[in-house]
Design a protein with these regions (language model features):
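N-terminal helical cap/lid subdomain that shapes the substrate entry/recognition surface
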Residues: 1-100
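Asp-based, Mg2+/Mn2+-dependent phosphohydrolase catalytic module
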Residues: 1, 35, 76-80, 99-106, ...
Length: 217
């Protein structure tokens, strides 16, 4: 079984906007509204194209998020502090259902992997959370040169795991990147949607459902 990370295993905490406002305040930009920053970030994230998770990509996204609040833009001032802040486990929280699900699957001998669109900060984060020990294979887009939904990153995971694609179930929170990408590589796929309700037809609202899901397969 393979997992996405952001939005699947961990989430920014308390939110992207809160972390951005926290860092901005340390650099003289006080009382910026986290809710507005969250909205700006979400809009910029939806509009992004060809995002490769480079520092330049992130700097541009941060500038868009702070548009109208800061001059000069963060890319010329405190962006490095934001980038480093998200390398710290205290900027993230493990979903309540993630660790119990991973431990249950590992105890049953299920081979686990990570397939994530991320940058060089991911492995240290997984280590800080002590999650890396559960995964036989960890594939990070910045290291392999391919991002989901490219089937190549899934195929690389299959080879490293030594398991045929059709025998691997991928779990993630993005229909386009995780479900469509996995299926293009002939993986099985399931969407994690903790808010319940999905147009996909193949979804779970808790990672705890995975144990019973594989028991039925």
């Amino acid at each position: 079984m393979s997992f996405d990370v952001g939005g699947t295993l961990i989430q920014p905490w308390p939110s992207v906007g809160h972390i951005y406002a926290e860092v901005a305040a340390r650099h003289g930009w006080n009382n910026l509204p986290p809710e507005t920053l969250n909205q700006n970030f979400a809009a910029a994230w939806r509009a992004k194209e060809s995002f490769q998770h480079t520092q330049e990509d992130w700097a541009d996204l941060v500038d868009q998020t702070f548009a109208g609040f800061c001059a000069p833009p963060p890319s010329q001032t405190f962006f490095p502090a934001i980038y480093e802040r998200f390398a710290e486990a205290t900027a993230w929280r493990i979903y309540d259902d993630a660790l119990p699900a991973i431990e249950a699957l590992a105890s049953k001998g299920v081979l686990l992997a990570v397939i994530s669109n991320w940058d060089e900060r991911l492995r240290p984060l997984l280590q800080q959370f002590r999650l890396e020990r559960y995964f036989e294979t960890i594939l990070v887009s910045c290291e392999v040169g391919f991002t989901k939904p490219s089937p190549v990153i899934f195929q690389l995971a299959s080879r490293q795991m030594g398991i045929a694609p059709g025998q691997i179930l991928h779990v993630g929170d993005s229909l386009a990147e995780d479900v469509a990408g996995a299926k293009a590589a002939h993986f099985q796929a399931v969407l994690i949607n903790r808010d319940a309700g999905s147009e996909a037809g193949e979804w779970i609202n808790s990672l705890r459902d995975l144990e019973s899901l594989i028991s039925r397969s």
